Amino acid sequence: MSGRSVRAETRSRAKDDIKKVMAAIEKVRKWEKKWVTVGDTSLRIFKWVPVTDSKEKEKSKSNNTAAREPNGFPSDASANSSLLLEFQDENSNQSSVSDVYQLKVDSSTNSSPSPQQSESLSPAHTSDFRTDDSQPPTLGQEILEEPSLPASEVADEPPTLTKEEPVPVETQTTEEEEDSGAPPLKRFCVDQPVVPQTTSES
């Protein structure tokens, strides 16, 4: 009985949340994807956030600065740190995203780069990804470290196939016997009669 009531309660709560979200969607005209910190934790997620008008932003900023700086100092350090977190959330991944975009542009403009070019491109881009090792990687940054592959592997062209000449069967068997490391097998010739060997050495 208690399980059903709990499920019904969460269902009704979810319906209320959906109604709130739908009402907010109707009011908001523009949305954008942003990195957002979840509560007081250090967990960050990439989600759709309503875009506030620049006028509203200016009003909220002016109200915050007037309320916080009567003496020229912030009223509390926690508010200042939350502002710093918001600033980092907005700008933290833009540089690495632009690096990845630049890598994709480079690989698309060079349709068939030579191996020397691809080797020279990849170390430069991997050093860009390693520049912010002072901060632990977040959920979004782990994905961005993948494009450290050479540009030749990232290119959209399919690999070219080369035609090899077939090797005669006789040479294949001799190579296999030599490579196996085992003693050579006895070979029988069809043309010559088989003569049993007698070991008369004593």
Curated annotation (Swiss-Prot):
Residues 53-202 are annotated as: Disordered. Residues 107-123 have a biased composition (Low complexity). GO terms for cellular component: chromatin; GBAF complex; nucleoplasm; SWI/SNF complex. Keywords: Apoptosis, Differentiation, Phosphoprotein, Wnt signaling pathway. Pfam families: BCL_N (PF04714). The modification Phosphoserine is found at residues 114, 118, 120, 122, 127, 148, 152. It comes from the Eukaryota. The keyword Phosphoprotein applies. One of its GO terms (biological process) is Wnt signaling pathway. Residues 90-99 have a biased composition (Polar residues). Positive regulator of apoptosis. Plays a role in the Wnt signaling pathway, negatively regulating the expression of Wnt signaling components CTNNB1 and HMGA1. Involved in cell cycle progression, maintenance of the nuclear structure and stem cell differentiation. May play a role in lung tumor development or progression. Belongs to the BCL7 family. PANTHER family: B-CELL CLL_LYMPHOMA 7 PROTEIN FAMILY MEMBER B, BCL7 RELATED. This is B-cell CLL/lymphoma 7 protein family member B. It comes from Mus musculus (Mouse).
